[in-house]
Amino acid sequence: MASPASITLAEVARHSSPNDLWIVIEGNVYDVAEYREDHPGGDEILRQFAGKDATTEFQDAGHSNDAYVKLKTLLVGSLQSKTLPENQPEESSRIVSIAVSDRGKIPTKRQARNGNDTSKYGQLPSLVLAGGLALLFFTLKQHPWQSIQGYLSQAQVSRVQSSGWVGFLGGFLTATTLNTAAATFVGLTAKKTLLLRHRELEEYPRVKQHYLPLPPKKPGISGENTQQFLTLVDRQCIAPNVYKVRLQGDGLVIGLGQHLKVLAEIDGRKIQRSYTPVSPVGNSPKVDLIIKVYPKGQLGNYLLNLPLQSRVEIRGPFGRYSPSPTWKHIACIAGGTGIAPIYQVMRAWPGEITLLYGNETWEDILLREELEQLVLQSPRRIKVHHVLGQPKSDWKGLRGWITREMIQDLLPEPSSSTGFLVCGPDGMVRAIRGHFEAIDANGEEKANVFVF
């Protein structure tokens, strides 16, 4: 089997268009152009890292074994070692077996240091014991009792004879000396053993631990081969050209931030589209999806005209997202149907959360009643700001597009304890990225931004 080609980072950067899209993950180069439409997280995430190294984001997002299997089919080659980023190891971390007979042949700096420490401490027990015996000999020479038993008898007499205080003091010093010598000998011997054990443990290589997001309390089944047929049981119009579709099935488990693929055969072609459920996460027989129907949208119109009680093919769920445990505040920016994954997080997140939600009109706001209910339940913890592009004349809220000034005025400042979640149309997401780049350039800390 031929070894994979060696590719420079500069060559990878030349493949950064939607139809010619290469990315780097863990030192390998992948061509993901044809995989954009099938990517569970949407093609926007892949285009974000076109021609770049996406190792950190790939590892932070968490992926199933199926994702690694799929990557093998997209492999182009490996990144040249000299072009690897500083934080990217040339080889994956692995545990190395070390034979006992080989230890110590080529000592490292740490081993040499530990060896000197143990030899230094190893001489102390003998010195202390010798000192204790010398002190005991000196004491017995000054007070020549026949034996320890005789000394004890002498000590008892000294309790009632005022002239025997010297004997009592000598006995006390003798006992103290013996106890100190014995305790020191045992303690330092044990310390020497522990230092040797510690040195042996340090001979093994340290394996770098990458941050992994916390899994959902009820993780969903993930994988492209997870296929089910659910029944369309309800369909309601909740905004102009937007419908809430309810599917019913058996044993479907949805985790936080996961989405489903809905598939249908239309005009002899298999069409698929990803949707994030807005129903509660966990094991539920019913799944609610938000579907926006466009005039030329094939799958949306298919679901709009599909008779109730019809079977709908789905795959997944895919993906997984959990906020960082170090975050205390989450700032969300959503547009249109991008509220679906944001709403999932808002409902599950126990900390503070602030939402900037952009729509054209008041009637276009999705899940408006559900969002209002969250605010009523936790008015101090949850805040929602609506931004309308074409509001009525009596609208007193925010107008136009979501701007950098809105982000800076209404959302928390970037910090290690704050996360930013973004989901919406591609144009809005690109604009928000530009705003954060400007904010990062002028701020002390960079924003922790995650795009669904």
UniProtKB/Swiss-Prot annotation:
Gene deletion effect: Fully eliminates the production of asperlin.
CC annotations in GO: membrane
Note on cofactor: Binds 1 FAD per subunit. Binds 1 FMN per subunit.
Binding site for NADP(+): 389-390, 395-399
Residues noted as binding FAD in the record, renumbered to the chain: 302-305
Cofactor(s) needed: FAD; FMN
Expression induction or repression: Expression is controlled by the asperlin biosynthesis cluster-specific transcription factor alnR.
Stretches that traverse the bilayer: 120-140, 166-186
Main location: membrane
Annotated FMN binding sites: 33-38, 80-83, 116-125
First and last residue of the signal peptide: none
Residues of the Cytochrome b5 heme-binding domain: 4-80
Function: NADH-cytochrome b5 reductase-like protein; part of the gene cluster that mediates the biosynthesis of asperlin, a polyketide showing anti-inflammatory, antitumor and antibiotic activities. The first step of the asperlin biosynthesis is the production of the intermediate 2,4,6-octatrienoic acid by the highly redusing polyketide synthase alnA with cleavage of the PKS product by the esterase alnB. 2,4,6-octatrienoic acid is further converted to asperlin via several steps involving the remaining enzymes from the cluster.
PANTHER family: NADH-CYTOCHROME B5 REDUCTASE (PTHR19370), NADH-CYTOCHROME B5 REDUCTASE-LIKE (PTHR19370:SF184)
Protein name: NADH-cytochrome b5 reductase-like protein alnC
Origin organism lineage: Eukaryota, Fungi, Dikarya, Ascomycota, Pezizomycotina
Gene label: alnC
